[in-house]
């Protein structure tokens, strides 16, 4: 039986997955991890993990508002992340 990953190890793995090669996306995802991840409910965490699986070019267009995200849950979290102060 696999052990559940402790929160610190999970955060380190997520931080690595948040490295997108685009500074702006790195900062947006990092901001979420630093400010919201620890208190986020499981459903919101699942949505964030879905975002991490998306392609960078799509994420860029969604975060910059050039294109609407087709998934309502993802779009809501993107809006929340964009609204976080720098």
From Swiss-Prot:
It is found in: Cytoplasm. PANTHER family: FAD ASSEMBLY FACTOR SDHE. An FAD assembly protein, which accelerates covalent attachment of the cofactor into other proteins. Plays an essential role in the assembly of succinate dehydrogenase (SDH, respiratory complex II), an enzyme complex that is a component of both the tricarboxylic acid cycle and the electron transport chain, and which couples the oxidation of succinate to fumarate with the reduction of ubiquinone (coenzyme Q) to ubiquinol. Required for flavinylation (covalent attachment of FAD) of the flavoprotein subunit SdhA of SDH and other flavinylated proteins as well. GO terms for cellular component: cytoplasm. This is FAD assembly factor SdhE. One of its GO terms (biological process) is succinate metabolic process. SUPFAM superfamilies: YgfY-like (SSF109910). It comes from the Bacteria. Belongs to the SdhE FAD assembly factor family. The keyword Repressor does not apply. Keywords: Chaperone, Cytoplasm.
